[in-house]
Amino acid sequence: MFTSGNVTARVFERQIRTPPPGASVNRARHFYENLVPSYTLYDVESPDHCFRKFTEDGLFLISFSRNHQELIVYRPSWLTYSTTDDSTTTLPPLPRRASKFDSFFTQLYSVNLASSNELICKDFFLYHQTRRFGLFATSTAQIHDSSSPSNDAVPGVPSIDKITFVLLRLDDGVVLDERVFLHDFVNLAHNMGVFLYDDLLAILSLRYQRIHLLQIRDSGHLVDARAIGYFCREDDELFLNSSSQAMMSQDKSKQQSLSGSKEDDTGENGLRHSLSQPSGSNSFLSGVKQRLLSFIFREIWNEESDNVMRVQSLKKKFYFHFQDYVDLIIWKVQFLDRQHLLIKFGSVDGGVTRSADHHPAFFAVYNMETTDIVAFYQNSAEDLYQLFEQFSDHFTVSSSTPFMNFVTSHSNNVYALEQLKYTKNKSNSFSQFVKKMLLSLPFSCQSQSPSPYFDQSLFRFDEKLISAADRHRQSSDNPIKFISRRQPQTLKFKIKPGPECGTADGRSKKICSFLFHPHLPLAISIQQTLFMPPSVVNIHFRR
């Protein structure tokens, strides 16, 4: 109805028109075309902290001290000041106090989370929005050794003496509960080894190949729900131990009935030793691995109707690669819903290195209720890619925060889908393109910003320089432009990290990070060099 697109026209349209069902949030987000962070305060006087992110509801700004010992939480506010200038044509200059960090943020508290030999993992943070709980992690130094102190540990996976997960109430900074993992390895970078779905928490132990499922109670306690790995059901261990004891007692009664000459033979063949120490010499596969092999076997068996062809197919596709399947370890895991997990399998080398592009990988869907594998794909499977292209939002778990449900993806945004198809058509090898796209699966939990300024139906920007993904990027001296989608030639605002006049030293490599508030026209850009001198903090807001 109104094509001008100014704020007055949009407000009037909102008064007289009702948006279609389910489109009220999208209609409201159109206001952000007019409310943009168009003003920048450069090199703001700020505390020397590592600023992590805004929470999903925008109530808190999470930061850590430079020594990675303390958590500092801020409450975003807004710049307020008065002026005696009666001019209506030009904006009055901001007072000097406006160039300070505490004009925009109020410190709520500071809490020491790490002991003397531990450090806070600055790349890890999960937010439970319903109760305003924050999950943090501390750890000791990583030990790079291939020796395994336990027979259950995977050789080649490094060890961390102590990993502590701390559940904290962000309203007042009270520590509610802790969970400690000793001599283990959990990938904490960018929340890769931990996934939060509603009140369920999944923690993947790479070293011991266990998925620890915990429940966050309303009281703030972490309660063990299940551990998936060697055992799949709660009573598996009890059943196996009772069966083992029955077998041992039966074998012992048989041995006692033998003659003295035969007792010496049984003492030499090692049978008793293997039964008395089942854990030390146990060659059984884990419960998850057995279910995976069983699913692969049945899938290959059902491909053919003739028994002769079935045997030939099993020899070629199953038995020939049997050891390769056995050697697979769990790399990453995410919830699809409260009953299903998406598990990524791969080699040991790919699980501990940062770049797993060249390592073979597989995806499995695991039903926690039936303890069965219900689907299995290779990382070059076209059918899995088709699901990923058409239903990407089903892989990114919905959140109770309304802002998180509108993060742009190629399954909910026509512009993102066009960009994906352009990249697909440009690719020389479709198989390599599929592998590259499926690298993002399983998705890291809470790894994208819900800010409307990353909505590609509203703004167009260079995704090589900035995006909704929670990652550091190489800094550029040129400002990042946000251009209107509705008016393709209209520049809405610019974001420039670093000093206003640029840096004199162009040789030093600079990285930057961007923290966008989920619903306010407010953003923080932090620029620093690789050698970590004091950061340059800019605040971008609407005047």
Swiss-Prot record:
GO cellular component term, pick one: nucleoplasm
Mind listing the UniProt keywords for this protein, alphabetically? Nucleus, Phytochrome signaling pathway, Ubl conjugation pathway
Give the lineage: Eukaryota, Viridiplantae, Streptophyta, Embryophyta, Tracheophyta
Q: Which organism is it from?
A: Arabidopsis thaliana (Mouse-ear cress)
Motif Nuclear localization signal — list its residue ranges. 421-436, 492-510
Gene behind the chain: DET1
Its annotated function is as follows: Component of light signal transduction machinery. Involved in repression of photomorphogenesis in darkness by participating in the CDD complex, a complex probably required to regulate the activity of ubiquitin conjugating enzymes (E2s). Involved in repression of deetiolation in the developing seedling. Repression of photomorphogenesis is probably mediated by ubiquitination and subsequent degradation of photomorphogenesis-promoting factors such as HY5, HYH and LAF1. Involved in the repression of blue light responsive promoter in chloroplasts. May be required to stabilize the CDD complex.
| Protein name per Swiss-Prot or TrEMBL | Light-mediated development protein DET1
Where the protein is mainly located, per its record? nucleus
Q: Where is the composition biased (Polar residues)?
A: 246-260, 274-283
Write out the similarity annotation. Answer: Belongs to the DET1 family.
Residues in coiled coil: none
Give the source's domain of life in one word.
Eukaryota
